[in-house]
C-alpha cells in the first residue's frame, strides 16, 4: 500500500477507515430517502458533456440521495444535446466545467438556452455552480463534494454529516 511504502501504514489505515465509514454512513442515509431528485451535471457546455453510468458522479449523486440524470447511459462521459436535457427535465442542474475556474462559469448563459425556463431545476431555482476540484477530479476530495451535494439535496437528512477530518 502507499501507506506502507511511505512508512505511515497506521495513519493510512485510520484515514482509509474514516473515508470508508463516511461513504457507508452517507449510503445508509441515501437508502432511507424515498424521493431522490435527478441531477444534471454539466461538464462542458458546447458540445454538451455530462457524466454517464460508469462515472464517479453517478455514485456521488447516489450517496448524496440523488440520481445522475444520465445514469442510464453506459459510458463514463456522455456527449448529448440540450434537447435531451429538456426531455429529461432535471430537478437540479450542477455546472462544473472541467478545467474551468469556478468564477468563470456563467449560469446566465445556460438560462439563455431554448426552453431553459421550463425546466424543473430552473423553476425551483436549483441551478448551481459547483467546484471543479470537488467533482471533476478523481481524488479523496470527492467525498467532500458528496457531503456538499447531500446537504444541498437533503439538508435535514444529512445535517450531521461532515467530510472526513483528514481533508
Language-model segments: which ranges?
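N-terminal ligand-binding lobe of clamshell/alpha-beta domains
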Residues: 1-167
Amino acid at each position: 500500500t502507499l501507506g506502507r511504502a511511505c512508512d505511515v501504514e497506521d495513519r493510512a489505515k485510520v484515514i482509509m477507515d474514516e473515508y470508508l465509514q463516511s461513504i457507508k454512513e452517507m449510503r445508509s442515509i441515501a437508502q432511507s430517502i424515498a424521493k431522490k431528485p435527478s441531477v444534471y451535471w454539466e461538464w462542458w457546455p458546447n458540445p454538451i458533456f455530462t457524466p454517464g453510468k460508469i462515472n464517479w458522479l453517478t455514485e456521488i449523486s447516489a450517496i448524496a440521495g440523488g440520481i445522475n440524470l444520465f445514469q442510464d447511459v453506459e459510458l463514463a462521459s456522455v456527449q448529448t444535446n440540450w434537447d435531451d436535457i429538456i426531455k429529461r427535465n432535471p430537478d437540479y442542474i450542477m455546472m462544473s466545467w472541467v478545467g474551468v475556474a469556478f468564477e468563470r462559469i456563467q449560469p446566465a448563459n445556460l438560462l439563455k438556452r431554448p426552453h431553459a425556463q421550463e425546466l424543473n431545476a430552473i423553476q425551483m431555482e436549483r441551478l448551481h455552480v459547483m467546484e471543479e476540484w470537488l467533482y471533476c477530479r478523481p481524488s479523496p476530495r470527492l467525498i467532500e463534494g458528496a457531503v456538499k451535494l447531500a446537504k444541498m439535496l437533503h439538508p435535514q437528512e444529512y445535517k450531521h454529516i461532515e467530510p472526513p477530518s483528514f481533508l
